[in-house]
């Protein structure tokens, strides 16, 4: 809008948006006359050493009178270091015709930076990341180290949330209030409730309920839904599963294709066996079930409400509500074994 207004007010045939760059390397330079009017724009490869010292650069954004633009384009040649047709040559052609050329400097050079290399892309991303982080901190979010915190532009974060270094929050993600996230975590397309604690976590296309604690070293795969007050501890992977309110998965579990009720306790080393080599099947665990350590739940299988599974069991049949399932060989102790094996 500013460029268009300046163009009309100046009654110019062409107006170019320029910027004063701290480092103008790689940009076309704006060359002005002693009176300050724009004479031409010269690409860096075609510029003289004196012209390369100029800090005012061409943003590549113009406002033209259409009739004059198309007339001048017919005269543009390719006699330059690149052998290309340069649009900025139109300005010199119009000036030679005695037409008025105008320039407007951008208020912030960062708005006009070009991206022609991986280095420039990284620089542009850093600028946008800094703006996002600044806005979050001004809204009440604590970033322990903004330089190592990466939050996409469209991500919303609630006030009083604390984010530790090396944390990525990207895509269609959102974070509630009063959370503690990171360090070294990545949340992609994930919705995080209020007062969630998550450290050393990778979550993709997930939902994490209020007051839930996740990590360290947890992988939440797509279609995982953790209800409120869930505990997912060390070295746990959850995939395509819904975990009920207050359930505990404290350590060393694989939970895949599972519908788990509220108040469930999963013992260390317990897994859902969801794949038979051809198809995947679901495991259903009722409310307040207690699954002992080192157990295998071979899907399709259902463990009823309030049921118990003894440690070390491999469960292949449904366990009715409030039943205890024991599926392991009886222990046999052989006395004086060292003597007998001789």
Q: What are the roles of these predicted feature ranges?
A:
Residues 17-18, 41, 104, 318:
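Generic beta-sheet signal
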Residues 1-35, 59, 63-76:
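Conserved beta-loop-beta/alpha segment of the NTase-like Rossmann-fold superfamily
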Residues 58-61, 153, 281, 299:
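Glycine/small-residue-rich pyrophosphate-binding loop that anchors the diphosphate of NDP-sugar donors
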Residues 39-130, 134:
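Catalytic-core segments of class I nucleotidyltransferases/pyrophosphorylases
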